[in-house]
Design a protein with these regions (language model features):
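Extracytoplasmic/secretory soluble proteins
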Residues: 1-248
């Protein structure tokens, strides 16, 4: 976008005038990462490292009831959780997971993260299809081409989840899911997103009425890659701010 002229060049004088605190707090090496052809185009998202592996927020109290005393720590644990919740609370819920047709991308990437040392090139590749490994970051490969046996196992697991009744039968065509809001009020058993969303869902806020209607309710989080310790911080340009070149 910067190359094609979509973003406004942010001069040092402009940043010092209109964003003085940001200018002072961002180190020079971070400004360098926000440059194209020597000009700054972005204000970085670098106030703190974001460890934002995606995963599932879930009812920790129900997981403990299912015998998972430490909560969900793997995809296998998650399957155990789903089976228990379906059998025990299925009639009280709208769905276990009111998923929609956009979730497949994060799901398969999460499976790969949990079952390999793959590290996607954040911010560059669509669908996290290309990256390196924790042992060899700079040799680029695609697990979609090399880890085919693992992906067959993932497909088998999704078939099992379908048979359990984890998601709606029209999941691939569903475009109107409000799963996160449904989790807040106790209508579903999980929400798939990342850790910053979990910090909201586990909080006793006015919108999270789940904790008012059930005093035992707790929300845990299983992040993709937890089994292997495969978690990385986001690039500081992931949520960086740019200004439209058409701004005046």
């Amino acid at each position: 976008n910067a190359k094609n002229g979509a973003f406004l060049e942010l001069s040092e004088d402009m940043l010092k005038t209109y964003a003085p605190k940001t200018w002072e707090s961002v180190p020079a090496e971070h400004w360098d990462l926000c440059k194209y052809n020597g000009e700054i185009y972005l204000m970085p998202e670098d106030n703190y490292a974001q460890w934002t592996n995606h995963g599932f927020a879930y009812r920790l109290d129900w997981a403990k009831e299912a015998g998972l005393t430490d909560g969900v720590k793997s995809w296998e644990d998650l399957t155990t959780y789903f089976k228990y919740v379906k059998e025990t609370y299925g009639n009280d819920l709208k769905y276990l997971w009111d998923s929609d047709g956009t979730q497949y991308n994060q799901m398969v990437g999460g499976w790969i993260t949990s079952h390999s040392n793959y590290v996607p090139i954040d911010g560059l590749n669509s669908g996290a299809m290309w990256g390196g490994s924790k042992d060899d970051l700079y040799t680029v490969y695609s697990p979609y081409m090399t880890d085919t046996d693992s992906l067959v196992e993932y497909a088998k697991l999704m078939k099992e989840w379908n048979e359990i009744g984890v998601f709606p039968t029209n999941v691939l065509n569903n475009t109107s899911s409000q799963n996160r809001d449904e989790y807040r009020v106790g209508q579903v058993a999980v929400e798939q997103h990342h850790t910053q969303t979990w910090t909201d869902l586990c909080s006793h806020t006015a919108t999270n009425t789940i904790y008012d209607t059930d005093e035992d309710a707790e929300t845990g989080f299983f992040y993709f890659g937890e089994e292997t310790g495969n978690v990385v911080a986001l690039s500081i340009t992931h949520g960086a701010m740019a200004v439209s070149a058409g701004s005046k």
